[in-house]
């Protein structure tokens, strides 16, 4: 995998453009999987050797997260988790995909620093949560 193909700054691109710029055949993680739609794009365009899908799939009553469109009721969260598990069952059995039902801060503790070639951060969308994800999954 070569990071020299990835521009230093990517501005005003949609994630559908971004995914085509990410390194291929590496070890990657998606933080905040929701229904798994972008996970499919990651597999298609980035073709990672290993993709870790990390999401708590749990409704949160935090005031700062209540308005988020992916903070759906608990039964819908369970349905999303089951759907993602079914959607990627083949890749899980082949060892290409691992599904982690956990909060990102908890999941990060299970990986050594520098394990990932890249991480797509799209879990909780608050400043503090994104900063924590960047800190927890940083290779440094």
Describe the residue ranges of each PLM region.
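S-adenosylmethionine/decaboxylated-SAM
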Residues: 2-9, 15-140
């Amino acid at each position: 995998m070569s990071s020299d193909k990835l521009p230093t700054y990517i501005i005003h691109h949609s994630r559908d453009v971004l995914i085509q710029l990410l390194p291929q055949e590496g070890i990657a993680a998606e933080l905040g999987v929701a229904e798994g739609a972008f996970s499919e794009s990651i597999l298609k365009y980035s073709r990672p050797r290993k993709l870790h899908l990390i999401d708590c799939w749990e409704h949160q009553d935090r005031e700062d997260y209540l308005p988020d469109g992916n903070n759906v009721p608990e039964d819908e969260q369970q349905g999303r988790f089951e759907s993602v598990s079914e959607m990627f069952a083949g890749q899980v059995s082949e060892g290409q995909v691992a599904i982690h039902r956990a909060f990102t801060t908890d999941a990060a503790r299970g990986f050594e620093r520098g394990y990932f070639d890249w991480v797509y951060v799209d879990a909780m969308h608050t400043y503090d949560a994104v900063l924590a994800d960047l800190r927890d999954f940083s290779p440094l």
